[in-house]
Amino acid sequence: MIKLGTHLSIAKGFANAAETAVYIGANTFQFFSRNPRGGNAKEFDEKDIIKFQEIRKENNFAPLLAHAPYTMNLGGTKDDVYEFATRVIDEDIRRMDSLGIEYMCFHPGSHVGGGVDFGIDRIVKGLNNAIKGDENITILLETMSGKGTEIGFKFEQLKSIIDKIEHKEKIGVCLDTCHIFSAGYDIVNDLDGVLEEFDKVIGIERLKTVHLNDSMMPFGDKKDRHAPIGEGKIGLKALIDFMEHPSLKHLPFFLETPFDDEGHKRELKMIKEILSSK
């Protein structure tokens, strides 16, 4: 069975998000581990969490994915920004693990002029301080588009981070189709080649989740602009082929497309109908 969901808001609680997932035809979902542009995290509501776990179990949800906030930058030069990022990643690993969330992804960071090697060293230090080794959750580095001074738009950069992680069994990769297309990996015309390169550089076993997004921007443009599935430069056929690839079809897929719940419901229905007709 395909593991397919979208990004959902938990502003009205985890149970509400889980109910929304069921309503739109998803069997998993992604959510922000805290306000994506804010600071402190809200305390969990016990009744909400109990109901959330019941819905999750009753509907046999696939692995869930938390997304760390955008304000978190482990790769930069400003010490106050770095200290905030290290606190957030440490807290949110603990918070998400307590809920039994299987994965948490994050944007590795931007070096903002410090240089790639400097940024990677900062990211590694932050992760090694946060990952204790006794967690059940797996932390995922997200593939990036390469805008500005982003780190993680080349597979080699992700490998450089992973190689220095102490508890390597707790680290993986979340592949974003829009991002890698924008970064110059041709998943439209050479998907096998891209996956072979990923396997050679990082190891395909490290790939745990997929952000399934089309791209508003052309190939190699290094800009992060998501488009609805089939309405961008990647196209419907390439994204369906991606989902059906033998090395990928077992993974959970999460849409981050610019739709509301009703739009996502239609989008999920379209994808499932195409997959089931083959």
UniProtKB/Swiss-Prot annotation:
The keyword Cytoplasm does not apply. InterPro entries: AP_endonuc_2, AP_endonuc_F2_Zn_BS, Xyl_isomerase-like_sf, Xyl_isomerase-like_TIM-brl. GO terms for molecular function: deoxyribonuclease IV (phage-T4-induced) activity; DNA binding; DNA-(apurinic or apyrimidinic site) endonuclease activity; phosphoric diester hydrolase activity; zinc ion binding. Keywords: DNA damage, DNA repair, Endonuclease, Hydrolase, Metal-binding, Nuclease, Zinc. Zn(2+) 3 binds at H179, D224, H226. Its cofactor is Zn(2+). Transmembrane segments: none annotated. Its EC number is 3.1.21.2. It catalyses: Endonucleolytic cleavage to 5'-phosphooligonucleotide end-products. SUPFAM superfamilies: Xylose isomerase-like (SSF51658). Zn(2+) 2 binds at E142, D176, H211, E256. One of its GO terms (biological process) is base-excision repair. Binds 3 Zn(2+) ions. It comes from the Bacteria. Zn(2+) 1 binds at H67, H107, E142. Endonuclease IV plays a role in DNA repair. It cleaves phosphodiester bonds at apurinic or apyrimidinic (AP) sites, generating a 3'-hydroxyl group and a 5'-terminal sugar phosphate. NCBIfam families: nfo. Belongs to the AP endonuclease 2 family. This is Probable endonuclease 4. It comes from Clostridioides difficile (strain 630) (Peptoclostridium difficile).
